[in-house]
From Swiss-Prot:
Source organism superkingdom: Bacteria
Organism phylogeny: Bacteria, Pseudomonadati, Pseudomonadota, Gammaproteobacteria, Alteromonadales
Protein name per the record: ATP synthase subunit beta
InterPro entries, A to Z: AAA+_ATPase, ATP-synt_VA_C, ATP_synth_F1_bsu, ATPase_a/bsu_AS, ATPase_alpha/beta_chains, ATPase_F1/V1/A1_a/bsu_N, ATPase_F1/V1/A1_a/bsu_N_sf, ATPase_F1/V1/A1_a/bsu_nucl-bd
Organism from which the protein derives: Alteromonas mediterranea (strain DSM 17117 / CIP 110805 / LMG 28347 / Deep ecotype)
Compartments in which it is found: Cell inner membrane
Subunit architecture: F-type ATPases have 2 components, CF(1) - the catalytic core - and CF(0) - the membrane proton channel. CF(1) has five subunits: alpha(3), beta(3), gamma(1), delta(1), epsilon(1). CF(0) has three main subunits: a(1), b(2) and c(9-12). The alpha and beta chains form an alternating ring which encloses part of the gamma chain. CF(1) is attached to CF(0) by a central stalk formed by the gamma and epsilon chains, while a peripheral stalk is formed by the delta and b chains.
HAMAP family assigned: ATP_synth_beta_bact (MF_01347)
Disulfide linkage: none
EC number: 7.1.2.2
The encoding gene: atpD
Pfam family, one: ATP-synt_VA_C
Function: Produces ATP from ADP in the presence of a proton gradient across the membrane. The catalytic sites are hosted primarily by the beta subunits.
Amino acid sequence: MSQGKVVQIIGAVVDIEFPQDAVPRVYDALRVTEGDLSGLTLEVQQQLGGGVVRGIALGTTDGLKRGLTVENTGNPIMVPVGTKTLGRIMDVLGNPIDEAGPIGEEERMSIHREAPSYEDQSSSVELLETGIKVIDLVCPFAKGGKVGLFGGAGVGKTVNMMELIRNIAIEHSGFSVFAGVGERTREGNDFYHEMNDSNVLDKVSLVYGQMNEPPGNRLRVALTGLTMAEKFRDEGRDVLFFVDNIYRYTLAGTEVSALLGRMPSAVGYQPTLAEEMGVLQERITSTKTGSITSIQAVYVPADDLTDPSPATTFAHLDATVVLSRDIASLGIYPAVDPLDSTSRQLDPLVIGQEHYDVARGVQTVLQRYKELKDIIAILGMDELSEEDKQVVSRARKIQRFLSQPFFVAEVFTGAPGKYVSLKDTISGFKGILDGEYDHLPEQAFYMVGSIEEALEKAKKA
């Protein structure tokens, strides 16, 4: 392959001069072949003219010197795919980082691929039961849909994601791919051990580009994970693709954009924000052979949902699960806001009339309680009408019944995790709305699985 020389280094951005007749294409992978950083991979981002290309380094550039030889591999970044990647931790280039020997893959695929054509895409609507009451009730997931977990720092995005992986691996025995994009290394480590302890590690491929890595790694690691998920889908499987955190993907794009000298747009984000997000999201889709159901954690800067990054993400999603700091402060976990969370599947034609009526009934009661809170704060409960007192009582029971002990949080809570089927979830909330459990104390509904457990808890109290 053609060889070039390093001519300029600015942080993670490196300019390399090639012969005029052998200039690498955009997105080609280049490899440094000499010096201390021999083996460092660069990805071409721009062709500057005069045989010079500008690349972004997928690794540290400390110790890189001008004049070093760089060779063009002639291909984009190629990563291992297939069942050999299950149970392994890899970096953005598909190299193992779990000290368990080579991957031994039978095939590698380019991380840059076209999205499936319109004819190939499937349009079937099938619900994916998660076993988490609040999600199954008010913002049900579709098989092959895209879900966003929105929340500020520390409200439980990663824990919710771990619970979803565990439930789907155990209850539905499906494969998952997890892309850790710009998150804490400690979380990546915890995640690995949690999956190991839950005996689901052999059903998950893990790809990490953590906070301490250069922006090129964080920008591309989501595509690495997606390529692995696409391979499973093309083999006819239903696969789950988890991204934690899609905001860091945007942020890495902002860093790369600034390093490449592009003009920033609103709030300092890259001018290509919508296009970069579209390139990733359009590939996450279901075809007639298999499905990719994607669950993406979305960090919301300063809890502001109108920030360009979360706002751009919203446009691509089928369901949004909004985690609320106010609900977390009440000690109700998962801290999902049932009034803010939505799903395109919440339609009687998709989920059936009974489910729809119960979900809307729950939201109506909670909304009325929210409106009455101001009156209660000023005048107290005694000033309410009997009807409103009943609404408040049921709303508080519903609020507590929306909480649930998680399997992955057993270590912290000391309570065994619960998986609640959709049927039990609907019948439980229907009973509360119909007044069947008005005689029970509200504390009986806190941190239980099905309604039967609430009845047991009330008897013991």
